[in-house]
Regions:
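N-terminal basic, low-complexity leaders that serve as flexible interaction/assembly modules and, when applicable
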Residues: 2-105, 142, 236, 240, ...
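Iron-associated oxidoreductase/ferritin-like identity signal
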Residues: 2-6, 14-15, 122, 149, ...
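Short glycine/proline- and acidic residue-enriched helix-loop micro-motifs
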Residues: 54-57, 118-128, 183-190
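Short, conserved acidic/polar surface loops in the N-terminal third of protein domains
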Residues: 95-99, 114, 164-168
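A glycine- and small-aliphatic-rich helix-loop capping segment at beta-alpha/alpha-beta transitions
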Residues: 100-109, 169-174
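A gly/proline- and charged-residue-enriched helix-loop-helix capping module
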Residues: 106-146
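Active-site loop segments of alpha/beta catalytic cores
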Residues: 132-358
Length: 358
């Protein structure tokens, strides 16, 4: 793996898992076909997911390991993807940090005691012990038992910047006023918040690995709001800390959206795989990034078309990769709720068929 890692903990990797197309691609080794998995592959576009969701709140689904595992395994096997990703949410970690989290139906997540000042940063708890999230690790353990033996399981977390932005804004944002105000006016408080967040995330990821995840993804969904200079000064050291502290040997996927101006800096922060959105050509991004695996970058809105268009657009992405080892096919964003399931199935089938090495 590309990073000099200092993290500890067990890493569960059988020979069958090590040799899977997904794990081979993470190591930039040739695979029998281009591996494919999809962000939010367990989600509202599936009737079976909606049936489960009708019985539980979103947080209940995350906090009931059997339920989280059920939707994870069902989606992975139904779609025949090359990796599963545990059903959870990037914001679960904020509760042990002392922040009040709510998912109101139809309104998205809200943090009721946001951080806006140095005094607020002081009250954010240092998460030395991540056992409060044992429901996530139990979901990982159950899922690892229930998945096909050779199918890798991905754990994940939000990146320090995206998590800190939620913490400062108290929810979603278009302009990140509270986040950037703290960043620009009190750099000390900002770095203190990011450091606390990064340490918590490292421990959280390693606990998922110890429970049975074979790889991890770090979601920096909001980092495209930053200039390269701001990223380097206010974000890069903290994301690098998270990645360096992941258990050695575990592939790290470093994903962001709107990051065309930040790709080289993201690589500098670390990751064995850089996740790309649809706004940058895969071949051009890869030329800039050099010796690293890439993940992406099908536009999730194209899944609203039909199987023929889906197949044609999948071919375009694969042609940009040109069969080079180290490409993991994915979307540039999560699957949207109204997406026709048959188009998602068609995408996975097309990737497998079109990329099969003769």
């Amino acid at each position: 793996m590309s990073e000099a890692r200092t993290g500890g903990g067990a890493f569960h990797l059988t020979e069958e898992l090590r040799d899977s197309p997904f794990m081979r691609a993470c190591r930039r080794e040739p695979a029998p076909h281009t591996p494919v998995w999809l962000m939010r592959q367990a989600g509202r576009y599936m009737k079976e997911y909606r049936d489960v969701r009708a019985k539980h709140s979103f947080l209940e689904m995350c906090k009931k390991p059997e339920v989280a595992s059920e939707v994870t395994v069902y989606a992975a096997h139904r779609l025949n993807v090359d990796a599963a990703i545990i059903f959870a949410d990037i914001l679960l970690i904020v509760e042990p940090m002392g922040l009040e989290l709510e998912f109101a139906r139809g309104e998205g997540p809200a943090i009721h005691n946001p951080v806006r000042s140095a005094q607020d940063v002081d009250r954010v708890r240092e998460v030395e012990d991540v056992s409060a999230l044992d429901y996530v690790y139990e979901a990982v353990r159950i899922t690892r038992r229930e998945l096909r033996p050779g199918l890798p399981l991905i754990g994940f977390c939000g990146a320090p910047f995206t998590l800190a932005s939620y913490i400062c804004e108290g929810g979603g944002s278009k302009n990140y006023v509270h986040t950037k105000r703290l960043m620009y006016t009190d750099a000390g408080a900002w770095h203190a918040l990011m450091s606390k967040t990064a340490r918590a995330l490292s421990r959280y990821l390693n606990a998922q690995v110890e429970a049975g995840a074979q790889a991890v993804q770090i979601f920096d969904s909001w980092v495209g709001a930053l200039s390269p200079d701001d990223y380097r000064e206010f974000v890069l050291p903290h994301t690098r800390e998270v990645i360096r502290n992941v258990t050695p040997g575990v592939p790290v996927i470093h994903f962001g959206t709107g990051t065309a101006a930040l790709l080289e800096l993201m690589k500098e922060a670390g990751g064995d795989v850089i996740g790309l959105d649809w706004r940058v050509r895969l071949d051009e991004a890869w030329a800039r990034l050099g010796d690293v695996a890439v993940q992406g970058n099908f536009d999730s809105v194209a899944l609203f078309t039909n199987p023929e268009v889906v197949r044609a657009r999948a071919r375009q992405v694969l042609e940009q990769a040109a069969g080079r080892p180290g490409h993991i096919f994915n979307l540039g964003h999560g699957i949207l709720p109204e997406t026709p399931v048959e188009n998602v199935v068609a995408l996975v089938e097309a990737v497998h068929e079109l990329s099969r090495r003769r």
